[in-house]
Amino acid sequence: MKPIKVLIIDDSALIRSLLREMITSDPRLEVCGAAEDPYQAREMIKQLNPHVLTLDIEMPRMNGISFLKNLMRLHPLPVVMISTLTQVGAPETLEALSLGAVDFIGKPKQHSDLGLSQYRDEIIRKLICAAGANVTAMEGVGKAKATGLDAVAQSKSLKTGFLCAIGASTGGTEAIKAVVSSLPLNSPPIVVTQHIPPAFSTSFAKRLDGASAVKVYEAQHQQPIEKGCVYIAPGDAHLKVSKTAKGYICLLDSGEMVNRHRPSVEVLFDSVCEQVGNKAMGVILTGMGADGAEALKRMRDAGSHTIAQDEATSIVWGMPGAAVKLDAAAEVLPLNKVAANIIKHALK
């Protein structure tokens, strides 16, 4: 098999050199070029036909966001953003994902907590995943918002004790937005785990809240779970659901990583299965790996309705694909049908 051709776009010579060294350490990848600004990158894309790009957000002459807008319009390619994993960098990175970037990773730092060897493993994994991503699905995500659910939801009342849990990873920020922004005010309570860094979950929840009729929160420990509300797991804690005499509440757990993740979809789904039982619904959306697939099967076996996003509309059909292989999903649906299905099963 021919190696995946990677084009690095970064104005720092040091970062370009570090990335090149790490990427070329894996025989499945080959650095076909390194550009110091988007203008140079534009010419290199024409000449070298890379399979995937790494793109810095902050660059002179033209920033990464402007370049990404043009690229996705004229020559869509899988892109992994190299961004500052801070609250300051979060809005720009989330915007890059909304414009069609597949994934993001922090900048390599020689003295970071995440050692360079761990960073190398992560960027290699993300580049290989991005190279196989469904770029045409990216174009459809923004159009996946469902309409007309208000009238349906207003005509009936919600089932008592019903709760929906959603899990996602790569491509998930936009897939979750497509689902949540389609929901009417009369929606069931929804809990969400998206693999995201700690500094990003607050921005993600705010961004979703601004785009939706329902109220979206970054989940707090012991926060009551109410209808018409969506609760997003913080980037450094597992989100669990607990049943109390007054109703469901959110619990946050900073314990060990599960399936290499904290928050983990598996942890959320298992707690929902245990606490909500057959009144729950489980939804697994686009994402790399298999986090949540086995727990979704346990939810289905316990009598919950379960959904996996279909391959055609998934950026990466890892997690939903794993769920389908395990027969964990009662239905496999395109992204634009998920919100309506949640409402259908939530109403009496």
From Swiss-Prot:
Highest taxon, organism lineage: Bacteria
UniProt domain CheB-type methylesterase: residue ranges: 157-348
Enzyme Commission numbers on file: 3.1.1.61, 3.5.1.44
Keyword terms of this UniProt record: Chemotaxis, Cytoplasm, Hydrolase, Phosphoprotein
Residue ranges of every copy of the Response regulatory domain listed in the record: 5-122
Positions of post-translational 4-aspartylphosphate modification: D56
Single Gene Ontology MF annotation: protein-glutamate methylesterase activity
Classification via InterPro entries: CheB-like, CheB_C, CheY-like_superfamily, Sig_transdc_resp-reg_Me-estase, Sig_transdc_resp-reg_receiver
GO BP, one annotated term: chemotaxis
A GO term from the CC aspect: cytoplasm
Location(s), subcellular: Cytoplasm
Top enzyme class: hydrolase
SUPFAM superfamilies per UniProt: CheY-like, Methylesterase CheB, C-terminal domain
Keyword Electron transport: no
Main localization of the protein described in the UniProt heading: cytoplasm
Record PTM text: Phosphorylated by CheA. Phosphorylation of the N-terminal regulatory domain activates the methylesterase activity.
Annotated active site: S169, H195, D291
Catalytic activity as recorded in UniProt: [protein]-L-glutamate 5-O-methyl ester + H2O = L-glutamyl-[protein] + methanol + H(+); L-glutaminyl-[protein] + H2O = L-glutamyl-[protein] + NH4(+)
Free-text comment about domains: Contains a C-terminal catalytic domain, and an N-terminal region which modulates catalytic activity.
Summary of the function given for this chain in its UniProt record: Involved in chemotaxis. Part of a chemotaxis signal transduction system that modulates chemotaxis in response to various stimuli. Catalyzes the demethylation of specific methylglutamate residues introduced into the chemoreceptors (methyl-accepting chemotaxis proteins or MCP) by CheR. Also mediates the irreversible deamidation of specific glutamine residues to glutamic acid.
Protein family per UniProt: Belongs to the CheB family.
Name recorded for this polypeptide: Protein-glutamate methylesterase/protein-glutamine glutaminase 2
Source taxonomy: Bacteria, Pseudomonadati, Pseudomonadota, Gammaproteobacteria, Cellvibrionales
